[in-house]
Curated annotation (Swiss-Prot):
Binds DNA as a monomer. Keywords: Cytoplasm, DNA damage, DNA excision, DNA repair, DNA-binding, Hydrolase. Its EC number is 3.2.2.28. One of its GO terms (cellular component) is cytoplasm. It catalyses: Specifically hydrolyzes mismatched double-stranded DNA and polynucleotides, releasing free uracil. It is found in: Cytoplasm. It comes from Salmonella paratyphi B (strain ATCC BAA-1250 / SPB7). It is an enzyme of class 3 (hydrolase). The keyword Heme does not apply. PANTHER family: G/T AND G/U MISMATCH-SPECIFIC DNA GLYCOSYLASE (PTHR12159), G_T MISMATCH-SPECIFIC THYMINE DNA GLYCOSYLASE (PTHR12159:SF9). The keyword Signal does not apply. This is G/U mismatch-specific DNA glycosylase. Belongs to the uracil-DNA glycosylase (UDG) superfamily. TDG/mug family.
Length: 168
């Protein structure tokens, strides 16, 4: 099981869709070697060095956290069922209300749309918020996602800059 890494007062909580098999086997988030999460958050400015999956708890040192919409591991996120995403969206709202980070970054447009019953959303900051928490949708860093790493970094950096502009 991949546990959440959450605490009050975080700048951002990154929300993946669900654990892949590598994460399920190791217990660490974004553990597959092809997953670009750790590289991207470092290059975007969220950490001062590239962490390894087994150092996930150190995210808290950078006021970042990690959670997921669905606990069930799969080979591909496309195997996650709609009812799991909807239930996960409700559970995620509860977590965010409890911890109140400055921002929630859901990693994947389709997962966000299905988990939050939204349609036709754009990348970036969303019109909805969870209390005082800004909601962002960023591209998923999975190695299965064809988006170039530079574009991922650009999208994540936009969130980092928005938080800096708010003094966070």
């Amino acid at each position: 099981m991949v546990k959440d890494i959450l605490a009050p007062g975080l700048r951002v909580v990154f929300c993946g869709i669900n654990p892949g098999l590598s994460s399920a086997n190791t217990g660490f988030p974004f553990a597959h070697p092809a997953n670009r999460f750790w590289k991207v958050i470092h290059l975007a400015g969220f950490s001062d060095r590239q962490l390894k999956p087994e150092e996930a708890e150190k995210l808290l040192d950078f006021r970042c956290g990690v959670t997921k919409l669905v606990d069930r591991p799969t080979v591909q996120a496309t195997e996650v069922k709609l009812h799991e995403l909807r239930s996960g969206g409700r559970n995620l709202i509860d977590k965010i209300e409890d911890y109140q980070p400055a921002a929630l970054a859901v990693l994947g447009k389709q997962a966000f749309e299905q988990g939050f019953s939204q349609r036709g959303i754009a990348w970036g900051k969303q019109k909805i918020a969870i209390g005082a928490t800004m909601v962002w949708v960023l591209p998923n860093p999975s190695g299965l996602n064809r988006i170039k790493t530079e574009k991922l970094v650009e999208a994540y950096r936009e969130l980092d800059q928005a938080l800096i502009m708010r003094g966070l």
